Amino acid sequence: AENNVRSTKKKVNVSVDFIESKYSRIDMSLNLVADTIGVNASYLSNIFKKEKGCSLSKYLTQTRLEQAKKYLTEYPDKTLIEIAESIGYSDVYYFSKNFKKYYGISPSKYQEERKM
């Protein structure tokens, strides 16, 4: 049983590493991660949530949005479209909506405040 727990943890850790290094891929998804590490998507979904306390897609969103905050601060001249694309969003509106939902402020306002 302990081996099983270790193997589960390892799969989740490999998933996390993959997400953190490839979050900018537009096609990043539960299915892509599952295929990459060679497990069934619903199995990965279950073990990921147990281990991390949130769904894989929520983890991906958080990873992308944390990166967006960095970019908005470090590259004040980049457009929201450029930033959205560089973190894996093909739709700038969806990116802005998610950002505002998570941080309570729009990315453009966040970027503006950093410029002052």
Predicted regions mapped to residue ranges:
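Short helix-coil-helix linker/hinge
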Residues: K9-V14, C54
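Basic/polar phosphate-binding segments, predominantly the helix-turn-helix DNA-binding elements
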Residues: N31-L60, A84-S106
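Terminal helix-turn-helix DNA-binding modules in bacterial transcription factors
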Residues: K50-S90, E112-M116
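Basic, amphipathic alpha-helical hairpins
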Residues: A1-E2, V16-M28, F48-K52, K69-K78, ...
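Hydrophobic, helix-rich cores of sensory/ligand-binding and other regulatory modules
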Residues: A1-K11, L30
